[in-house]
């Protein structure tokens, strides 16, 4: 007697390329299977370029992006932090071309000093002069600290930084194609979705307003407990230069709104007031802000982003409350003390 199995075979990633070229939409599982083949180096450069171009023309679905991110997470070097209710990442897609100072990096240390565990995932500069990795390196952080030391940073100090290049080695198979295309592809938005420590709560900045709802839906599909996705009038983070397009994920529901800085107790400022410079110059701005200094515009934009992060992590009842808490932390110098302790912690690997 033949016994039929009710177990469905996993999708064959090798067949998904043809589906994409036909204009078909993939399920999350199918997209994950295709990206797994990419991560394994089993998709030729020509086929990958064609698939990325087809996706760009047709437009990716939330399920496809979630599947791609799922495969990236599976292939990443893991950072095993102790179980906790909240583990936050504050990250942007980049690509806004605004050349601001390192707002999300500074924000991460303010939020961690306020008591929220942070596992920040970041890279060197792509479209700016100084990425999060560049400025943290300038501040004495060892970017090549091993995963266990980064996990210990989260567990013992409340913060860890994961240099993306070290945690996603499988992306090397896609790197030549991405460089040759010289255009935005789905890979530009996957990095913030593939935190190697498995952040439960995320603040994600994006470079187009229509991506706010899209990525919030992706994060819901990926099981995030809470998230805020923002486009800040040309910035891939909350801005103090105009309105913010925001989609929040809370209790499994998406809430879309336009948020003005004045609602949260911060003033409007011109974009020129938040421009940064070289890694050394941005490191000095971060140091000033974490020790209670900086300009009013710099303080306001970090306080706003930190306030939103504290709200996302469910530590305050409103962004305005979070802004007030962030101002207290910056004035106290606790964020700078934390950064110095974390830098010393990472240097243990080099000694």
Swiss-Prot record:
Alphabetized, the UniProt keywords read: Amino-acid biosynthesis, Aromatic amino acid biosynthesis, Glycosyltransferase, Magnesium, Metal-binding, Transferase, Tryptophan biosynthesis
Provide the residue positions that the database annotates as binding anthranilate 2: 178
Q: Which GO terms describe its biological process?
A: L-tryptophan biosynthetic process
Provide the protein name: Anthranilate phosphoribosyltransferase
UniProt: 5-phospho-alpha-D-ribose 1-diphosphate binding residues: 92, 95-96, 100, 102-105, 120-128, 132
How does it associate, per the subunit comment? Homodimer.
Among InterPro entries, the record links this protein to: Anthranilate_Pribosyl_Tfrase, Glycosyl_Trfase_fam3, Glycosyl_Trfase_fam3_N_dom, Glycosyl_Trfase_fam3_N_dom_sf, Nuc_phospho_transferase
Q: What is this organism's lineage?
A: Bacteria, Thermotogati, Deinococcota, Deinococci, Deinococcales
Gene label: trpD
Q: Which Gene3D superfamilies match?
A: Nucleoside phosphorylase/phosphoribosyltransferase catalytic domain, Transferase, Pyrimidine Nucleoside Phosphorylase, Chain C
Protein's job:
Catalyzes the transfer of the phosphoribosyl group of 5-phosphorylribose-1-pyrophosphate (PRPP) to anthranilate to yield N-(5'-phosphoribosyl)-anthranilate (PRA).
Q: Which cofactor does it need?
A: Mg(2+)
> Which of this chain's residues are annotated to bind Mg(2+) 2?
236-237
Q: What family does this belong to?
A: Belongs to the anthranilate phosphoribosyltransferase family.
The protein's annotated catalytic reaction(s) are: N-(5-phospho-beta-D-ribosyl)anthranilate + diphosphate = 5-phospho-alpha-D-ribose 1-diphosphate + anthranilate
User: What remark does the entry make about the cofactor?
Assistant: Binds 2 magnesium ions per monomer.
Q: Does the keyword field hold Lyase? A: no
* Pathway in which the depicted protein is active: Amino-acid biosynthesis; L-tryptophan biosynthesis; L-tryptophan from chorismate: step 2/5
Q: Name one GO cellular component term.
A: cytosol
Q: Name one GO molecular function term.
A: anthranilate phosphoribosyltransferase activity
Q: What is its EC number?
A: 2.4.2.18
């Amino acid at each position: 007697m033949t016994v039929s199995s009710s177990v469905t075979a996993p999708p064959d990633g090798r067949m998904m390329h043809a589906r994409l070229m036909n204009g078909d939409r993939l399920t999350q599982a199918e997209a994950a299977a295709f990206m797994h083949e990419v991560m394994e180096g089993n998709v030729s450069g020509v086929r990958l370029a064609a698939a990325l171009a087809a996706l760009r023309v047709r437009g990716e679905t939330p399920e496809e992006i979630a599947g791609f991110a799922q495969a990236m997470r599976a292939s990443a070097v893991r950072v095993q932090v102790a179980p906790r209710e909240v583990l936050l990442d504050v990250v942007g897609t980049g690509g806004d071309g605004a050349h601001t100072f390192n707002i999300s990096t500074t924000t991460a240390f303010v939020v961690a000093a306020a008591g929220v565990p942070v596992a920040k995932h970041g890279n060197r500069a792509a479209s700016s002069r100084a990425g999060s990795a560049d400025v943290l390196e300038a501040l004495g952080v060892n970017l090549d600290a091993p995963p266990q030391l980064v996990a210990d940073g989260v567990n013992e100090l409340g913060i860890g930084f994961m240099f993306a290049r070290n945690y996603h080695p499988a992306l090397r198979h896609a790197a030549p194609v991405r460089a040759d295309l010289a255009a935005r592809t789905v890979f530009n938005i996957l990095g913030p979705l593939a935190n190697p420590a498995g952040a439960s709560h995320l603040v994600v900045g994006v470079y187009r307003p229509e991506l706010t709802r899209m990525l919030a839906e992706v994060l819901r599909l990926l099981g995030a407990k809470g998230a805020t996705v923002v486009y800040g009038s040309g910035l891939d983070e909350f801005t103090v230069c105009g309105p913010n397009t925001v989609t929040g994920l809370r209790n499994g529901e998406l809430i879309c709104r336009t948020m003005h800085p004045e609602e949260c107790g911060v003033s409007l400022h011109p974009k020129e007031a938040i421009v940064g410079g070289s890694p050394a110059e941005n490191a000095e701005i971060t140091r000033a802000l974490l020790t209670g200094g900086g300009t009013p515009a710099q303080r306001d934009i970090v306080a706003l982003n930190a306030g939103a992060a504290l709200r996302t992590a469910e530590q305050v009842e409103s962004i305005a409350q979070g802004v007030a808490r962030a101002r207290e932390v910056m004035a106290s110098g606790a964020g700078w003390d934390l950064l110095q302790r974390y830098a010393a912690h990472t240097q243990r690997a080099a000694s």
